[in-house]
């Protein structure tokens, strides 16, 4: 079907099959090579007259995909590179009507065996084997001018192609529409050659132009998409491949495209973003060119399809429509024309660019209108003042509606308050200082629940009480921070001041107060308005004044010289004045205490020790408290206090001398870390010992104490004492037990005590004379003794001297002053080597009686004796602490609590009873009972000898109406190494007793015999002044069980848990000679600690306060040792 001399390819497959043509596979006409020799290598610019006859001169189909020349010559033509050349099927589809019928032409083109000819050489003149792949230079010379919609098939399936990349390049190469039209199908192809040559010439002239790069970019774009299909940089990479592949072709002409492409991609990855920007810009322009070109092509196709007629020869029918569609490029868009037309396009784009940014600058009319309105409104507000005022009023009303301004009535009320000078001056007193401190110090950790609880408790306080409490807290804080001698004392962040809340029946019950760094909480109620405590430190007095500084009997209470204690007591009953305490010593802090209107004593405990004394109309209750670590005290409902043993660090001895009408000698110093707990209530004498959340055991003092007078020490240690006096019935405190009956006369039995050599003698210089004719009265009708602290026998001790408490305690209540001119004497006899150790003697004193105490260094293992407190007529100890360093008349009870302390818990609403909880460690003081029964007759008319305690165990004695509580009363005696010392409770005169006391003694007698075997553990007497038992964190105290009778309750003795175990099972032991607090008819039930047993090297002294976990006990502790086994041990 070819023209003259034209022959088909050697393979009969080279044919085009139009889908609409009558001939299914018409032969593709090719001109003979002789007619146009340079037509055979279609990829080379000069010889392409024949290729344009079949394909347009711009068609790079075979050139780009197949570097070798196509076999288009006749049979046996010199251009045949090999008979086994590969075949490429090219499908050309055209759609159209009758003029341009839809056609699908398949071109089966063979490929030579990778041979190429030099440009301009005839088909037969092969230069030899060329690179199997098209190099960059070759590709450059055959850039197509147009892309056509011709699809190729078959290259991937070419088996003879040794390198697969050749087949892979076929789909990548963009096919271009290059049909020459009906003119080139005549056979000779001359017109087509003449048409295509100018375009080739133009293309060669602009080979280095951007248009050439654009064509290469079109080719490389598909290649780049294959390697970077997911990358948005495909267009830029295509631009990058143009110069890179060209350079690689020049450096290594033998490098194939597939070898060079990975290198180019790698180079692209190492290119910086800045360098890539050039290629991004180039790709952007190329994309614009492509879009414009596609638009032009579409226009040309539409125009050409309308103006061209189909080819007349039947065999060329399919070519006619094709030509009408795609072969117009050489004629209408020659390369030169394309370059000419592209220039105006660029200028046109440049001309269009300026308007493009102008479009966004156009402001919408709505925005312009809004802007104008805003400007007019702004100008109008400034010009029209009236309008502005109206708007401001509207804004103000709106703000008020939003709640920005409070109610005008509230504003006026605030202004009125601020105008009052008192309101402004008391702001600090009303606002909680600790709360402010917490707010200003974000570093401190504050428990909000504790603060809320404290604030709720404060709701029950009156304004005067609240102001007093705040002032005291502020002064304490200043005192704790200002003095340099306080040895780094700091206030704890726990709730400050002593607070109280009201229970159901309106009575106040104290709750935990301020705690110092080394002190304990002082419980009590703040004194009435107008009272201010005055604390004197270093000679400087700080406000703590009371408008009424008179005692009820009209006598003022001067401050002792050593203490500079200046209590200003209120004249009215139950309204004691605040008590100021001065500490002159080695950096110990004495904190002022506040007195409550109803007799409660409260004070904030600063670091160090604080004396809390409540002076009711007749009573001067004193409370000592030793604390170690400031901790939050468990809720103390009814004046509960924990007694921590006095800290023996430095063996600082402390003597408290309080006199009414006379100066007390002796240096009153509180041991470091100890602080008296606020205890007494209105009209009631009571001492409460509280541990400041530290371990209840005291610091062990010197094991090898050197004998020296107490005066040599910087301060004298004061054992906890209790002064009970005046009306207990008037107690506004909600004690668990109220004292219904008290001993009319209290007499201290002469007790024989031994103390070890090498220990300092205790006592005060001179005899302690209590006001003659005075009897101590804890309640309205009777007086009782509440022993506190370690062992009960706490009289001033001295080597070979006996300390006397000469003055009888005065009973302030008229009906109970039956026993006047009575004295308490404690006689010390025996060998000096046996030192009465760890004795804690509660001192009862009122009004004019003086009291002092000194602390001696006691070895923990020394034998001690128990002092039995009883009533004795005008007995005195002539030599009272001659060696003690306390100046002035002072009685020196001892409390050397070295380790865990025993707990005395009192709890009842009817009668005050003693609740004893014995600590696991025994006391050092030993009482002796020759009879081995360890009991005292109820009336104490005849003295009883107490068997020596094996483990220095002691019992606290509680005075009953006719019986003075004895050491044996609370605990059975244990044999000890020596029995040289025997405590003989004796009563010379006993006044009539209350009927409840008789019943109590009867009950005690019944239970004494059954439980005397278990009385060995008597080293704890703990006084609790709360209606709810305070359970220590480690060892909870069991609640008291109501015993019926007259409403009194039995203070069940609770066993503190051992070092590792929970609290031991208590078992009560009744004692005939023991009364709780001379109060309720119910006898005190003591449950000795089961852990105590014979053979224990040391017994820990008793202390008032919640049982705390002791330091590692140095004795064996069998929590459940029966009395029989203990008895057998004693027999051994």
Swiss-Prot record:
Residue spans of biased composition, Basic and acidic residues class: 932-942
Effect ascribed to mutating residue 1046 to R: Abolishes methylation by N6AMT1
Disulphide bonds in the chain: none
Biased composition (Polar residues): 487-497, 697-706, 883-892, 950-971
Modified residues (Phosphoserine): 1026, 1029, 1031
Sequence positions bearing N5-methylglutamine: 1046
Site (Breakpoint for translocation to form BRD4-NUTM1 and BRD3-NUTM1 fusion proteins): 5-6
Cell compartments where the protein resides: Cytoplasm; Nucleus
Region (Disordered): 1-56, 337-365, 383-405, 476-584, 693-714, 873-892, 922-1017, 1031-1132
Keyword DNA repair listed: no
Membrane-spanning intervals of the chain: none
Residue ranges of coiled coil: none
Expression sites (tissue/organ): Specifically expressed in testis.
Residue spans of biased composition, Basic residues class: 337-352, 1123-1132
Primary location group: cytoplasm
Biased composition (Acidic residues): 395-404
Function: Plays a role in the regulation of proliferation. Regulates TERT expression by modulating SP1 binding to TERT promoter binding sites.
Family: Belongs to the NUT family.
Disease: A chromosomal aberration involving NUTM1 is found in a rare, aggressive, and lethal carcinoma arising in midline organs of young people. Translocation t(15;19)(q14;p13) with BRD4 which produces a BRD4-NUTM1 fusion protein. A chromosomal aberration involving NUTM1 is found in a rare, aggressive, and lethal carcinoma arising in midline organs of young people. Translocation t(15;9)(q14;q34) with BRD3 which produces a BRD3-NUTM1 fusion protein.
The protein's name in its UniProt record: NUT family member 1
């Amino acid at each position: 079907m070819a023209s003259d001399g034209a022959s088909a390819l050697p393979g009969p497959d080279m044919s085009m099959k139009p889908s609409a043509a009558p001939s299914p596979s018409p032969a593709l006409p090719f001109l003979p090579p002789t007619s146009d020799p340079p037509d055979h290598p279609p990829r080379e610019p000069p010889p392409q007259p024949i290729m344009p006859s079949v394909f347009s001169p711009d068609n790079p189909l075979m050139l780009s995909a197949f570097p070798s020349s196509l076999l288009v010559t006749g049979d046996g033509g010199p251009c045949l590179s090999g008979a086994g050349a590969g075949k490429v099927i090219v499908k050309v589809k055209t759609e159209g009507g009758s003029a341009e019928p839809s056609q699908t032409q398949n071109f089966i083109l063979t490929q030579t065996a990778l041979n190429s000819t030099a440009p301009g050489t005839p088909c037969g003149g092969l230069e030899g084997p060329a690179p199997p792949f098209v190099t960059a230079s070759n590709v450059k010379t055959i850039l197509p001018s147009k892309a056509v919609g011709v699809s190729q098939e078959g290259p991937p399936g070419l088996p003879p192609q040794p390198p697969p990349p050749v087949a892979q390049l076929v789909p990548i190469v963009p096919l271009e529409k290059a049909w020459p039209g009906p003119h080139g199908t005549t056979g000779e192809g001359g017109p087509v050659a003449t048409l295509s040559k100018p375009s080739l010439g133009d293309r060669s002239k602009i080979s280095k132009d951007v248009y050439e790069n654009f064509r290469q970019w079109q080719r490389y774009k598909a290649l780049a998409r294959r390697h970077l299909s997911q990358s948005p940089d495909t267009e830029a990479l295509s631009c990058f491949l143009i110069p890179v592949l060209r350079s690689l072709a020049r450096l290594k002409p033998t490098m194939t495209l597939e070898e060079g492409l990975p290198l180019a991609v790698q180079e692209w990855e190492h290119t910086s973003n800045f360098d890539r920007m050039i290629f991004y810009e180039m790709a952007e322009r190329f994309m614009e060119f492509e879009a414009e070109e596609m638009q032009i092509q579409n226009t040309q196709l539409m125009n050409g399809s309308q103006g061209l007629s189909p080819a007349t020869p039947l065999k060329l029918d399919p070519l006619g429509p094709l030509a009408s569609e795609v072969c117009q490029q050489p004629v209408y868009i020659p390369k030169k024309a394309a370059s000419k037309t592209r220039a105006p396009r660029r200028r046109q784009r440049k001309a269009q660019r300026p308007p493009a940014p102008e479009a966004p600058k156009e402001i919408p009319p709505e925005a312009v209108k809004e802007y104008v309105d805003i400007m007019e409104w702004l100008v109008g507000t400034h010009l029209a003042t009236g309008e502005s005022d109206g708007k401001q009023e509207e804004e103000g009303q709106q703000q008020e509606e939003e709640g920005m301004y409070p109610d005008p009535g509230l504003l006026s009320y605030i202004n009125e308050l601020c105008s009052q000078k008192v309101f402004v001056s008391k702001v600090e007193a009303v606002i909680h200082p600790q709360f402010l401190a917490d707010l200003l110090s974000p570093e401190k950790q504050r428990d909000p629940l504790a603060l809320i609880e404290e604030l709720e408790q404060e709701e029950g306080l009156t304004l005067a009480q609240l102001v007093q409490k705040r002032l005291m807290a502020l002064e304490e804080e200043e005192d704790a921070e200002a003095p340099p001698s306080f040895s780094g004392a700091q206030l704890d962040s726990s709730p400050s001041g002593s607070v109280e809340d009201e229970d159901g029946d309106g009575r106040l019950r104290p709750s935990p107060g301020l705690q110092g760094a080394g002190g304990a909480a002082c419980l009590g109620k703040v004194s009435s308005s107008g009272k201010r405590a005055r604390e004197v430190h270093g000679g400087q007095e700080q406000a703590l004044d009371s408008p009424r500084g008179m005692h009820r009997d009209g006598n003022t209470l001067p401050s002792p010289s050593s203490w500079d204690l200046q209590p200003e007591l209120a004249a009215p009953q139950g309204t004691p004045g605040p008590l100021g305490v001065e500490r002159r010593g080695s950096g110990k802090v004495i904190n002022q205490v506040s007195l409550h209107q109803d007799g409660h004593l409260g004070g904030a405990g600063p670091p160090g020790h604080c004396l809390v004394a409540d002076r009711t109309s007749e009573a001067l209750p004193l409370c000592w408290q030793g604390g170690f670590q400031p901790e939050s005290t468990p809720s103390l409902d009814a004046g509960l206090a924990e007694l921590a043993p006095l800290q023996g660090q430095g063996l600082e001895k402390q003597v408290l001398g309080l006199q009414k009408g006379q100066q007390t000698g002796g240096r009153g110093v509180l041991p470091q870390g100890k602080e008296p707990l606020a205890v007494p209530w209105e009209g009631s004498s009571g001492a409460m010992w509280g541990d400041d959340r530290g371990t209840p055991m005291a610091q062990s003092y010197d094991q090898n104490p050197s004998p020296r007078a107490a005066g040599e020490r910087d301060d004298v240690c004061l054992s906890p004492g209790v002064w009970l006096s005046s009306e207990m019935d008037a107690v506004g405190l909600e004690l668990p037990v109220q004292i219904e009956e008290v001993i009319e006369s209290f007499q201290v039995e002469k007790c024989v005590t031994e103390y070890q050599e090498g220990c300092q003698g205790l006592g005060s210089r001179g005899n302690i004379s209590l006001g003659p004719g005075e009897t101590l009265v804890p309640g309205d009708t009777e007086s009782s003794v509440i022993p506190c602290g370690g062992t009960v026998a706490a009289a001033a001790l001295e080597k070979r001297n006996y300390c006397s408490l000469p003055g009888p305690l005065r009973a302030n209540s008229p009906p109970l002053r039956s026993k006047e001119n009575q004295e308490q004497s404690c006689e010390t006899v025996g060998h000096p080597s046996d030192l009465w150790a760890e004795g804690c003697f509660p001192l009862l004193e009122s009004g004019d009686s003086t009291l002092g105490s000194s602390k001696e260094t006691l070895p923990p293992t020394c034998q001690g004796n128990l002092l039995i407190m009883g009533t004795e007529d005008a007995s005195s100890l002539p030599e009272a602490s001659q060696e003690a360093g306390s100046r002035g008349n002072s009685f020196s009870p001892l409390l050397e609590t070295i380790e865990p302390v025993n707990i005395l818990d009192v709890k009842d609403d009817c009668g005050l009873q003693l609740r004893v909880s014995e600590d696991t460690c025994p006391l050092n003081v030993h009482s002796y009972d020759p009879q081995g029964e360890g009991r005292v007759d109820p009336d104490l008319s005849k003295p009883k000898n107490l068997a020596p305690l094996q483990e220095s165990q002691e019992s606290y004695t509680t005075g009953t109406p006719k019986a003075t509580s004895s050491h044996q009363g609370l605990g059975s005696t244990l044999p000890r190494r020596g029995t040289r010392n025997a405590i003989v409770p004796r009563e010379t005169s006993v006044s009539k007793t209350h009927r409840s006391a008789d019943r109590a003694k009867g009950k005690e007698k019944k239970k004494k015999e059954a439980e005397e075997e278990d009385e060995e553990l008597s080293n704890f007497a703990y006084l609790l002044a709360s209606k709810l038992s305070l359970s220590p964190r480690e060892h909870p105290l069991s609640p008291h069980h109501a015993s019926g009778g007259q409403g009194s309750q039995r203070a069940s003795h609770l066993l503190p848990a051992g070092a590792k175990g929970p609290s031991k099972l208590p078992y009560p032991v009744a004692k005939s000679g023991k009364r709780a607090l001379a109060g309720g008819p119910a006898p005190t039930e003591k449950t000795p600690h089961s852990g105590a047993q014979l053979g224990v090297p040391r017994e820990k002294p008793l202390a008032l306060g919640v049982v705390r976990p002791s330091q590692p006990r140095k004795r064996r502790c069998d929590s459940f040792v029966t009395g029989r086994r203990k008895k057998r041990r004693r027999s051994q």
